[in-house]
Amino acid sequence: NEARKHNIWIVAGTIPIASKKVDKVYSCCIVFNNFGDIVSSYNKIHLFDVNIVETNEKYRESDYFLDGDSIAYVDTPFCRIGLAVCYDLRFPELFRRLSSQNIDLVCMPAAFTSFTGKAHWEHLIKARAIENLIYFASSAQGGYHVSGRETYGHSMIVNPWGETLDIIKNKSGVIISTIDINSQKNLRKNFPCLDHKKL
């Protein structure tokens, strides 16, 4: 309803969607067009099964979730958007696959832990944007949870040169930036590293 009401496209966060296994669900990111129709969805591929020794945190997403097996992107009236979710950010191969589909922008909902976010969040987003010459928009959950877990926040928009266009650190809010597709095309033409890759 909100997409239709405000005439906007929405890349929603993740919701649990039934999978082929009765006891597990997919962590699914859904895209709505400005008419409120679901036009794309992506099942998170990389599940967060880690031990963070420094903070005594343990996560086992694979206990509850089934991993997805395919990339997802969608054509919009303004650009081609690729989808990723949270821990996917640590796997450059996913973004290279998306890049091979000529995406212009990655949209990624996330909930990095406070510890890993402080160390890696901005570096990884900028690296993925630079190495694929893409815009990157990530909505990031931040703050304390009832369980005591703390997430890092820092929703941000980064351009293909790795510059932060807008950021909101650790609170609710909205960030807005202009995506300049012509500038991106010129950058890809003048700095054609994607055409130079050998492996």
Where are the model-predicted features located?
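CN hydrolase (nitrilase-like) catalytic-core segments centered on the catalytic cysteine
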Residues: N1-V11, R80, C86-I175
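Active-site catalytic loop in hydrolytic enzyme cores
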Residues: K20-Q101, S114-K118, H123, K189-C193
